């Protein structure tokens, strides 16, 4: 069966500290025609990448807990740049802080097909205030 390549031409950031999960997500995205930044396994690296590549990113996949550090500063930066994202987590999705409760959230272990559907449903890249190529 041929892939739909629904994400062709899109560019996503993966922020995940578990190698196998990150690798699996990256492979699934690339098979759908997307390009991937990362995976990045820590908050500092993710913040740097968002700052450097914000004008290119179509979205991001965020693990909430990165070896004890919460990913929320990255989520805040993405929201500031109006870059959509989805949480993929071992935590209960309903336990997120109020500013993020409306964001898409998938529980681990993540069904890759479900992740691809969520990503395909995120808004397309738009010019972003304060972000210049």
What are these regions (language model features)?
Residues 16:
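Conserved acidic carboxylate
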Residues 63:
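Active-site residues of response regulator receiver
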Residues 39-59:
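Acidic, metal-coordinating helix/loop segments flanking the phosphotransfer/catalytic sites
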Residues 108:
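A Lys-centered signature of the CheY-like receiver
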Residues 19-38:
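Two-component/phosphorelay signaling modules centered on CheY-like receiver
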Residues 68-73:
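Acidic catalytic/metal-coordinating carboxylates
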Residues 1-13, 111-133:
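Non-catalytic signal-transmission and effector/linker regions of two-component phosphorelay proteins
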């Amino acid at each position: 069966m041929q892939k739909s390549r629904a994400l062709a031409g899109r560019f996503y950031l993966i922020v995940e500290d578990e190698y196998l999960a990150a690798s699996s997500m990256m492979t699934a995205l690339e098979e759908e025609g997307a390009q991937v930044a990362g995976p990045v396994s820590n908050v500092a690296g993710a913040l740097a990448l968002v700052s450097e590549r914000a004008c290119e990113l179509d979205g991001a996949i965020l693990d909430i807990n990165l070896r004890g550090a919460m990913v929320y500063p990255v989520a805040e930066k993405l929201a500031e740049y109006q870059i959509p994202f989805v949480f993929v987590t071992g935590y209960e999705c309903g336990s997120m802080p109020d500013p993020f409760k409306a964001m898409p959230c998938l529980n681990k272990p993540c069904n890759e097909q479900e992740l691809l559907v969520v990503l395909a449903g995120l808004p397309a890249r738009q010019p972003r205030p304060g972000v210049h190529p």
